[in-house]
């Protein structure tokens, strides 16, 4: 059967063992890690198989027959005999639930294999829903106890109805297997996988803790910088009343300058009227003096207007600077609150990590 073309009916992961063909007593593990074990339907031969691939070779390629029996020898270990392959397979699962699921699926596949055999004998064809036709589980074969109730093994019959000699040979092979040793080996490999996962999780936690500590230092430095900035801005805000007094004095100076400008404008206008109005016996020297006074007043007036505009500009800049300082203080305070909250979260995370570390 080509597993690349067929989809598995059911798949799980387990540590795979085979009975030692030389001693018929010890179990040989297929590897240090759990392998994928799947049920497949071979449509070409109209049979069901249990397949497990390790690397580039098939570790398990067992055809399920109606006479096979899957026996649970512990809470996490089960086994079955394959007379065609002349071996016994053992599976060590990570949990009792996985073992129960595999055993239930074994019963369903065995029933489907029985239906497939009956249909083949009747000349019919097995449809793709043969597995779903299994409505009842076939009771397991009687158990044979050789060393007490804790070491129950099963009696498996060949699909081709082997004789008493074959059955006795299988019974002897199974009875001589060290069930306790297999259970311990399965538990050992399961613990190895668990330890590897825990070690990886611990390394990730340590890396995360280091990263959190670095982030904590960065946050602390940034928070300290923000505290200094807030202190500077608060000092600037505290100095605002003094600046406010200066601004009031500036405003008064502006008002005085405006009054002086208006007065000078009036004087200029009066002088212009005098210079252009009808006069008796005008004197050239007096007229020139008057014109010079007018020019001086106009020059002074222009200077006053320029000073007024400069002072108004300074006043607006001072007001804008004050508003910017207030806004910057508000933003810095908000950012400081956020950083303090993040620091609190980092401390809580480090505390939880320290409690969880062994």
Curated annotation (Swiss-Prot):
Residues 1-113 form the WH1 domain. Residues 268-277 have a biased composition (Polar residues). The WH1 domain interacts with the PPXXF motif in GRM1, GRM5, RYR1, RYR2, ITPR1, SHANK 1 and SHANK3. Keywords: Coiled coil, Cytoplasm, Phosphoprotein, Synapse. GO terms for cellular component: basal part of cell; cytoplasm; cytosol; dendrite; glutamatergic synapse; plasma membrane; postsynaptic density. Residues 257-267, 280-290 have a biased composition (Basic and acidic residues). Residues 95-122, 190-355 form a coiled coil. This is Homer protein homolog 3. GO terms for biological process: G protein-coupled glutamate receptor signaling pathway; negative regulation of calcineurin-NFAT signaling cascade; negative regulation of interleukin-2 production; regulation of store-operated calcium entry. Transmembrane segments: none annotated. It comes from Rattus norvegicus. Residues 137-168, 239-296 are annotated as: Disordered. InterPro entries: Homer, Homer_EVH1, PH-like_dom_sf, WH1/EVH1_dom. One of its GO terms (molecular function) is protein domain specific binding. The lineage of its organism: Eukaryota, Metazoa, Chordata, Craniata, Vertebrata. Postsynaptic density scaffolding protein. Binds and cross-links cytoplasmic regions of GRM1, GRM5, ITPR1, DNM3, RYR1, RYR2, SHANK1 and SHANK3. By physically linking GRM1 and GRM5 with ER-associated ITPR1 receptors, it aids the coupling of surface receptors to intracellular calcium release. Negatively regulates T cell activation by inhibiting the calcineurin-NFAT pathway. Acts by competing with calcineurin/PPP3CA for NFAT protein binding, hence preventing NFAT activation by PPP3CA. Tetramer. Encodes coiled-coil structures that mediate homo- and heteromultimerization. Interacts with NFATC2; interaction is calcium independent; interaction competes with PPP3CA for NFATC2 binding; interaction is reduced by AKT activation. Interacts with NFATC1 and NFATC4. Interacts with SHANK1; forms a high-order complex at least composed of SHANK1 and HOMER3; the complex formation is regulated by CAMK2A-mediated phosphorylation. It is found in: Cytoplasm; Postsynaptic density; Synapse. The keyword Phosphoprotein applies. The modification Phosphoserine is found at residues 120, 158. Belongs to the Homer family. The keyword Kinase does not apply. SMART domains: WH1. Pfam families: WH1.
């Amino acid at each position: 059967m080509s597993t690349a073309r067929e989809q598995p009916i059911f798949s799980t992961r387990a540590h795979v063992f085979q009975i030692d063909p030389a001693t018929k007593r010890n179990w040989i593990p297929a590897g240090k890690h759990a392998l994928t074990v799947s049920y497949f339907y071979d449509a070409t031969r109209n049979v069901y198989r249990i397949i497990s691939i390790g690397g580039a070779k098939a570790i398990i390629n067992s055809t399920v027959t109606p006479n096979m029996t899957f026996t649970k020898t512990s809470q996490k270990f089960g086994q079955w005999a394959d007379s065609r392959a002349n071996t016994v397979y053992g599976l060590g699962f990570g949990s009792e639930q996985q073992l129960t699921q595999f055993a239930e699926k074994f019963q369903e596949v065995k029933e489907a294999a029985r239906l497939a055999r009956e249909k083949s004998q009747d000349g019919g064809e097995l449809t793709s829903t043969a597995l779903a036709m299994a409505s009842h589980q076939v009771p397991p074969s009687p158990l044979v106890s050789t060393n007490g109730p804790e070491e129950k093994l099963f009696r498996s019959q060949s699909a081709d109805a082997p004789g008493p000699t074959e059955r006795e040979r299988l019974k002897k092979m199974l009875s001589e297997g060290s069930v306790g040793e297999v259970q311990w080996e399965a538990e050992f490999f399961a613990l190895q996988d668990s330890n590897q996962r825990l070690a990886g999780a611990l390394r990730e936690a340590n890396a995360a803790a280091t990263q959190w500590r670095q982030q904590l230092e960065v946050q602390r430095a940034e928070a300290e910088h923000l505290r200094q900035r807030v202190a500077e801005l608060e000092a600037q805000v505290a100095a605002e009343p003094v600046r406010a007094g200066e601004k009031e004095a500036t405003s008064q100076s502006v008002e005085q300058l405006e009054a002086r400008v208006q007065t000078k404008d009036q004087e200029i206008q009066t002088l212009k009227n005098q210079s252009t109005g009808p006069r008796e016996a005008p004197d050239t020297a007096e007229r020139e003096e008057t014109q010079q006074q007018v020019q001086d007043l106009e020059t002074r007036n222009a200077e006053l207007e320029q000073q007024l505009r400069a002072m108004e500009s300074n006043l607006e800049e001072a007001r804008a600077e004050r508003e910017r300082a207030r806004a910057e203080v508000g933003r810095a305070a908000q950012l400081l609150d956020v950083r303090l909250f993040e620091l609190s979260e980092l401390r809580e995370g480090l505390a939880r990590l320290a409690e969880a570390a062994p």
